[in-house]
Amino acid sequence: MQPSPPADRPFDVLGIGAASIDFVHVLPGRIALNVPSPTKRRIDRRLVLCGGQVATTLATSVSFGLRATFAGAIGNDENGARVRRELVSRGVDVTDAIVCDAPNQYAIILVDERSGERTILWDRHPGLALGERDLRPGALAAARIVHVDDVDVDAAIRAATLARAVGAVVTTDIDEVTGRTMELVSASTFPIFAEHVPSAITGIDEPGDALRALRRTHPGVLCATLGARGAIALDGSELVQSPAFVVEAVDTTGAGDVFRGGFIYGYLQGWSTARTLRFANAAAALSCTRFGAMASVPFRDEVERLLQLG
């Protein structure tokens, strides 16, 4: 992987993207949203927790010993205040967070009690979209890495472009395919895709071949999370495949976000791509053994113990 950015910046990672209140509902048996007729399901357990892609990645980064700051949008309602308090309690700086005149992003998460797999229903108010004035080059220059997701893809592209211009490395959480996805890929140093995205972009089913096809548009490391199959990355011409760790999963919510926190940590340690993926996979696996997104973030010593066992 490429050399690290300057180490003398106030923060290791700055995040812009989703910070959510999650209403987690644990259901007995398999979740099926495409049932042919109306149905009723009893909820076994209900939790109200904090999450969101970028917010969870920042919480993970701090848990591993990094300095993190959130500069994304938060609602001006009680849910937004709760997310802000949660970030602060986990050691994430929120000085540059943008409090918008809108309700905070939220999600309803249905968790299959047997497998831990989840279905996420989410909403984000248009008033949470960031404008050009909200993205300050000075704030972006204060971090070694700027991490963005694609919930506000316009802001993500602007932030990534500005961050690269001031010498920061940009990592991403790309979960959807839109007309601007490839702009975000091009603006990023390390695009990290959800499992389905490379195939959706290229039309190639095999993940490794899909990443190779994307190599024509991006010269750097390309990474994709693969759920229960782990993760893969294309580093130069080398395809690095890293299997998942086998755990007893109770909730897979936030696993990809925790993976990205592990990836950022490994990169800043100067590790090889293979070692970085293995660490990130171990972190993601541990997060699946607990409910919630931020609530499932492991500590570095827990990850190291799992690595020793594995």
Segment roles from a protein language model:
Residues M1-A71, E248-A249:
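Glycine-rich phosphate/adenosyl-contacting loop at the front of the ribokinase-like
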Residues E86-D101:
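A glycine-rich helix N-cap at a beta->alpha junction
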Residues V62, R164, L268:
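Gly/Ala-rich phosphate-binding loop of Rossmann-like dinucleotide-binding domains
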Residues M1-L14, F23-V26, R42, P207-G310:
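Conserved phosphate-binding/catalytic region of the ribokinase-like
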Residues A97-V99, I109-I145, D150:
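Conserved phosphate-binding/catalytic loop of the ribokinase/pfkB sugar-kinase fold
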Residues I157-Q241, E248:
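Conserved phosphate/ATP/ADP-binding segment of small-molecule kinases
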Residues D8, A139-A141, L184-S186:
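A short, aliphatic-rich alpha-helical micro-motif
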